[in-house]
Amino acid sequence: MLINHSFQVDQPIDQVWNFFDDVPLVAACVPGADLTKEVGDDQYEGDVTISAGPVKLEFSGELKIKSRDNTKKVIVLEGAGADKKGRGAASVVLDASLNSLGGSTRVDLAIDLTISGAAAQYGRGLVADFTEVLIDQTADSMKTRMTAIAEGRDPMAVGAPQTASGISIAFSAFTLAVK
């Protein structure tokens, strides 16, 4: 499933680039994500937990920087994991491209998400709607954390919820589905 998402940050491109070059900080913006260990240069192990009502998916896997272009301000992250209960797997390639808008920056995300097993049974439309809500929450967290950095505050003290869960995601996804 291919998903494109763009947002604007009221920070200069070099500050936004420094943020995206910090994988643990970027991962902390994803609801339910937790990097547990750095296993090598630009390679990490971690977990992602997503729950909605009675459905709870817990993935364990790896995330790495696949490529980085400091001149063009493009970074590609690649992740893959398996459900801890053996009910499926997921992989993602996130391509983040930054474009200067004077004193602010446009962030263009291209996300290629593949889900198999139990999570895939809910149908492409529902998974796409849930994913869109999670991406919106991630983008909001990124903007909040970048603002905290610019203001000299601890970016880890603000931002994403600990887990991606339940009612708010389900309601937002339902709202998207009926539009």
For the regions a language model picked out, list residue spans one by one.
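Hydrophobic pocket/interface hotspot
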Residues: V16-F20, V26, I65, L109, ...
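Intrinsic-disorder/low-complexity, polar/charged segments enriched in Ser/Thr/Lys/Arg/Asp/Glu/Gln
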Residues: L2-Q8, Q43-E45, E58-S60, V74, ...
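Hydrophobic ligand-binding cavity/cleft-lining segments
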Residues: M1-Q43, D47, S51-G53, S165-K179
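Glycine-rich portal/gate segments that line the openings of hydrophobic small-molecule binding cavities
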Residues: E38-A80
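Beta-strand/loop substructures that line and gate deep hydrophobic ligand-binding cavities in soluble
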Residues: S67, G81-D129
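A conserved amphipathic terminal alpha-helix motif
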Residues: A118-P155
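Short, highly charged C-terminal tails/helix-capping segments
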Residues: D140-K179
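Generic structural detector for well-ordered beta-strands
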Residues: S6-Q8, T49, K64, S97-N99, ...
